[in-house]
Amino acid sequence: MTNIPAELAYTAEHEWVQDLSEDSTFKVGITDHAQSELGEVVFVQLPEVGDTVTAGDVVGEIESTKSVSDLFAPVTGEIVSVNDELADNPGLLNEAPYEAGWLFTVRVESQDATAQLLDAQAYQQLLD
């Protein structure tokens, strides 16, 4: 069964978003379902710190032994940090997609930046 933490928000593109409760900053990663479908992740291309991203835009890609998949911005804002550990160990996405395998953090300007995201129950229904 797919792990879907209740405290996170989700996108239909199988990304999760965590409110870090500091300066309107959110941490972003891919879901357990996504990493399972991708198979062994071998390379991750992330956005650059300082990039301005728009929700729904392609901001990078994830390459696995099965395919190459686009990485989408779940919210609009500025990239504050990226997970540099993924350059040397992209398999963290498979091992710990909600912890060590996070992708990037983004600072949003709008208070309702996450209004379009799914809660855990809605994401589970999407998968069913």
Swiss-Prot record:
Signal peptide: none annotated. The keyword ATP-binding does not apply. Binds 1 lipoyl cofactor covalently. Keywords: Lipoyl. Transmembrane segments: none annotated. GO terms for cellular component: cytosol; glycine cleavage complex. It holds the Pfam family GCV_H. It comes from the Bacteria. The modification N6-lipoyllysine is found at K66. The glycine cleavage system catalyzes the degradation of glycine. The H protein shuttles the methylamine group of glycine from the P protein to the T protein. This is Glycine cleavage system H protein. The lineage of its organism: Bacteria, Bacillati, Actinomycetota, Actinomycetes, Micrococcales.
